[in-house]
Structures are given as C-alpha cells and as structure tokens.
Amino acid sequence: MGVGLCGRGIVAKPRLYEVASDLGTDSKTLMGILREMGEFVKSPSSALEPPVVRKLAKAFAEKYPDKVEEKKEHTPPAPVVETPKAPPPLPRPIIRHAVRGVPSGAPRPGNNPYAPRQGMGQLATPGPATKRPVKFKAEGDKKPASTHRRVPAPLPQKRTPLRGRGAPGAFGRGNKPKSRKSKTLKRQEFEMRDAPVIGGVTIPRGDGRVIRLMQGASVTDFAEKIDVLPANLLSVLFHLGEMATATESLDEATFEILAEEIGYKVQIVSPDDEDRALLESFSVNLAAEHAEDSELDLAIRPPVVTIMGHVDHGKTLLLDTIRNTNTLAEESGGITQHIGAYQVSVGDRFVTFIDTPGHEAFTAMRARGAKVTDIAVLVVAADDGIMPQTIEALDHARSADVPIVVAVNKIDKEGANPAKIRQQMTEFDVIPEEYGGDVMFIDISAKTGQGVDALLEAILLTADAALELRANPDRTARGVTIEAKLDAGRGAVATVLVQSGTLRVGDRVVTGCAYGRVRAMVDENGLPVESAPPSRPVRVQGLSSVPKAGDSFIVVAEDRQARQIAEKREANERNAQLAKSRKRVSLEDFTRAIQEGRVQSLNMIIKGDVSGAVEALEESLSKLDVGEEVSLRIIHRGVGAITESDVNLATVDNAVVIGFNVRPDRKARDRAAREGVDVRFYSVIYDAIEDIEKSLKGLLKPELEERKLGLAIVKEVFHSSRVGTIAGCSVESGSITRNAKARLIRDGVVVVSDLTVTSLRRFKDDVTEVKSGFECGVGLGSCDDIRIGDEIETIQIVEKPRA
C-alpha cells in the first residue's frame, strides 16, 4: 500500500480513483470512508489534498486489514517465481497425451509469424530436448511437440497447490470475495432478524450508537452514516409526522426525533469544531501553531482596546479626540453605524482602538468587539449616569474576561457628578482604586480633551500590570475581520486586525467564505502599507466577496487551497441556514392550520452597505416577539445595492425588501414597480425595527409614502465660485423640479441624503422644471461630492392612509 501511494509522489493532488487503485479497492468504498471522516467529494475524479490522502490510507488500513494483506500477497508477480522451475522429464505416454490434447482448445504459442522459427525452438533447454524431437519426428508431429516441451500441460495444475490460493487471473478468481460476501450477508441477516419495523420498513437497531452530523445535514447524510437507504429513513419520518426530502437540510430537533425512534443518538457538531476539522484537513492547525512558538519567537505587541458605553455618551468623540480627526459627522444622527479600528501612538508605544456601536440593537457587533480586545474602556457620562447599554457593555467585557478602565466623560457639563458614577459602579462590583478596588477611573472631557492623556497612560498601565501581550511576528498571519463592505472601484474591502504573524501584500488569505490575494493594504489614514504586524488594523483589498464582521482570517500557501476552504465553508453555512429556516409542520395540524388561517409568515430580504449593519438588523428582527400567529422569516441577506435578482426572489416568495443605506439599480427599481414588490429604505436601524414590529402587530400609523419625481444621471461636473458645484445632468425619467427633496446615489448606495435642488438651469436660463429627455444643470446646495455617473433622485413625501 505504501509503495503504491509513494509511487504517485510526483502528483501533487491525486484523484480518488488513483488512490483506490493504489489501495486495491474501489472508489465507492473510499467515498464512504471520506464521508465518515467529514470529507465530501463529488466523484471518483475529484482531487484530494495530500493530508487527506494520508488520513484516508490510515483509515482504510484500520477498517479493512484483510484487503491490505491481500494487496501485499498479490504484489510479487507469478512468472518470476515459476520460470526457473523446470518440470522433470515425463514418460512418453504422458507427452503423447498432451500432444493429442492440443486441438481441444489449448493455446498454441508456436503460431507467431514473426518468430525466427515456428515453435520458438531456440528457447528450448539443452539436454533432454535433443532426444524428444527425434521421437516426435517419427510420428510427424514436430511443431506441437516443440510447443509443449516449453510449456507442459500439467504445469497450471501444479501452480495452484504451490501458491495455496488462486492466482490473479482466470484460475481461482472470486474465492475470497465469495467468502467475504457470505459473511456480510450472514451478518446483515442476523442484524435484520430482530430489527424493528417502522412505517413499513425495517431499520437496523442503533443500540445507542452516537452519530456525528454537521449543521444542515440531510437525510442522505444520516443514511450513509448508518448504512441504510435514504428512502427507508424518509418512510420513518413520514410515520412520525414529518415531511422531508432526501437532500433537504434538517434541524437538530428533527434528527433527534428520528434517531431516537431507530435507536441512535445524534450529535450535531458545533460550527467551531466543524471549522477546526475543516482547517486540519488542509494541514492548518491553529492550536498547534501557538504551541510551537518559543519564548525567543514572541515579541511585545500593542494592546487592543474596545471603547464601550451607552448611546450618545461620547465614545466616538473620545476616539476622535485621540485621533485628532472627526468621523462623527459621517454617521447618521451622530450615532456610530459601523465598526472602525485605528492605531494611535502614545510616546514610543502604540495602542489599537476598536470603536463599537453603542446601540442595544448592535449587541452582536459589540460582543464581537469584546472577543478580539485586550482592554475595555467603559465610557459613562457624568451627567446621565449608568444606563441600560452601560450595563450591557459591562456584561460583555466580563464575559470576555478582559480588564476594564472606566472613563467618566462630560465632566465639563453642568450637573456632572463623577463621584456619583463611582458610587453607582460599586453596585455592579466595579470598585474604583480610590475605594480599595482594582479598576482605574479617569475623569475626562472628550470635547475639550481634558484627561485624555491620563486615560491613555491608564490603558498602558493596565496592560503592563494585568496582561502579557506577546505574539510571534515571524509566522503567517492570523487575525479577525473587524468590518467589511463593498466599495465602488475597489470591490470587497475588509478591515482586519492582525493577531499573530505579519500580513503582507501578496499573501493568500481566507476569511469566512471569502478568499483572495491581498492586492493592497492601507492604514486608518488611507496611506498604503506593505506589511501589518500583530495588533495592527489595516484595510485589505482583493477579496472575492464581502466577509462577515467577526470572521477569522488565515494566510494559506496556495490559491487553490484558499478557494477550497472558502467553498466548503460556504456550503456548510448554506446547509446550516437551510436547516435553520426550515419550518417544521406536523401532519396532524398542517391541514387544520391552513383551513383556520393561523399560519402567517412575513418573508424579508435585507440588503445593507456593510455586513455588520445587516447582521445586527437581522439579529434584532429575530428577537421580535409578535405572538405565535405571525412569524418572521429572513430568506436572504447581503451587502451592496438592491439588484433585480433580489426583486425576483421577493416576487416568488412574496417578500418585503429592506434597504439599509442602499438603493436599487434601475432594473431592480423598474421590476419592483412592475411586480408590486414592497421595497423600503432606512438609514437608522431603529426606524426599520420599529416599522417592522408595528407592521407585524398591525399598529402602524398612516405611513409617509415616498414618491419618486425624477431621476437624472450626472454627465459632467462644473465648479462655480458663486454657486458652488454644478452637476450637468441628463434627465432619465420623470422630471427634476426646483426646491424638491433629493438624494445622491453612487453605485446603488446612498452617498448623501436630505438634499434640496437649490438651483436648476437649462442652458443659461433658470427654470422650475426639466422633464425626461432633456439636459440641465443641477445645484444641490453645499454638496460638493458629486462625480460623473452619479444619480440624482428627486422625491416627494406624502401621507398615505393604511388599508
């Protein structure tokens, strides 16, 4: 076996049928072993990774030791053993009998027309052969005699007892398989003798055996594990009142019911274990890599700090003061919508900050920020005190087991009482150092900058006292995706935080279901960088798709390996989503529910500009409690503009499309209007949650309907010192009216909203309206960020009574 596998050493990734040939078995047997190992191949021609081949060979040897021995017995060829053994001279009657038997079907090797002499007499052995031709010549039978002097007839009969078993040919074929087959049949008959009959089919007893399945597994996967037909399991499910197909992903509860009925126990592998096994199959073992790091390889890395706190308590303003920048104006209503990561210098050291949203709705994003952080800075306003989000942020920091530094903000405002904040925090077991505890409290003013330097010093002191922050910068990079979005002109852009190793331009990375080669990296200031050491946040370009916030990223050696890991992760995630969204309706109450109209479902499609916002909105909607009569199903979510395929999916499933800071393209807009699909747009997440909750409960007030007046495409951009930026536009649909509300759209994403058409000109004349098919100059007030190809959409807000 080992020789066969090594013989293909020049092939980097052998095919499954080649491995089966080396092991002396068939591809179907190896495919079954691969499924038990958690590896899934499509066909015998699928290529296997070298680690998978080694594991497969080991598993095959353990499961089929008899086949391995059989392979070893058949290795030496028969002709090498038999050729030097010449038979002894036989009596004359036996030779004549062999000659007479030639016409009855024995092979005649003496009929080769290209041989120097018929019968190949030149190969005859000297000695006895010189007398035998004389005897045959008298009988006129020279050629057959020479033929059978070389290969005597009794030789095949003597070969069998010498070897003890049939040679690999026509003689003795099938002796061993027949015995194995009969044993298999006997074992199956014995097992099926007492097997229970459920739903008209017979299923072998499980006797409590544990079957490990991945999330989103199907009936076919379960059937292959226990070696039964999927149709039999479907019959059992039907008998239990469950309707399913062989390839449909089932949830854990359904598998537990099915397994209990037939005597098995099902264990659903957790996503972390599943992903760990997937990486190990590609020779990527993260735990082993960390264990291999010696003390000499480790270097001090900067601390990673997460700023947490209640909404509008000054988290982003504090970070802006530290960075000496202003990102607050870019957020809707002054509320942080997206996660940002930045690194600042404090003397000769660095500190990495992660700015998490302060909403309760963004619980998942904030919790994910706590998982990658070393120190949590809890911002509490001195005038407001402790709020619900403050307690929530404190719980996340404690669950992540990270030290806490409390920043008492807004001490410059009237009514500020920092001492009261310290007293309130003691009620939650956060004891200040002034009271004999171990938590540092720093009074600051993010607006004036007072106490910010002291806060940075407190962060470094806490890191030095409570933590040992070291990492190996000389290995391949590992880290976490902080945020990701689809950027116009750049494609998928992800903000990643390197946790160990060094990330370099050109590395092949895998993060979640996305993969690619790092084409470029920029820091928080937009400057290009060639490498990122541990605790360094950078924006990465070159990914195939938009990963999720919180996905871990790794660097692999080959593009093919990165693609295979991402594709397997995507398939596993798709199966898990199908299992989660599957509605389990029993046969007993299915008809009754349809007749009474109790089963009602609201299907939704969510599209957003960044993955973190989409995930947070989805999680918030899943927590809505609207009773048992109405259910909420999110059938699709994604990042980017609303496309025509989204509208088509909404048409088929009668779904509502929610756009968070994104707009539909022209085809999607026309299709939605033609099909009557409800498409709603939001820029603040709480507005979307409130509307959907009220619509589910039937408590919506008369809605404010947004009517589209016109759409213009920017063809040229002009700059005027008197008016400002003028967009030379072509009106594509409707009409553009002066003083109308407008928004600026770029690549399907709303860049600026709440605009007003302040000036409208056609040639040199001021006009009040320009209709479709004409060109005009449009001024949008103080908005200067206008580019060629942008869309200017004018709208009108009207009240619409609800039906």
Swiss-Prot record:
Residues 300-468 form the tr-type G domain. Residues 445-447 are annotated as: G5. Its main location: cytoplasm. Residues 65-186 are annotated as: Disordered. The keyword Nucleotide-binding applies. Keywords: Cytoplasm, GTP-binding, Initiation factor, Nucleotide-binding, Protein biosynthesis. GO terms for molecular function: GTP binding; GTPase activity; translation initiation factor activity. Residues 334-338 are annotated as: G2. Pfam families: EF-G_D2, GTP_EFTU, GTP_EFTU_D2, IF-2, IF2_N. It comes from the Bacteria. GTP binds at residues 309-316, 355-359, 409-412. Belongs to the TRAFAC class translation factor GTPase superfamily. Classic translation factor GTPase family. IF-2 subfamily. PANTHER family: TR-TYPE G DOMAIN-CONTAINING PROTEIN, TRANSLATION INITIATION FACTOR IF-2-RELATED. One of the essential components for the initiation of protein synthesis. Protects formylmethionyl-tRNA from spontaneous hydrolysis and promotes its binding to the 30S ribosomal subunits. Also involved in the hydrolysis of GTP during the formation of the 70S ribosomal complex. This is Translation initiation factor IF-2. It comes from Tropheryma whipplei (strain TW08/27) (Whipple's bacillus).
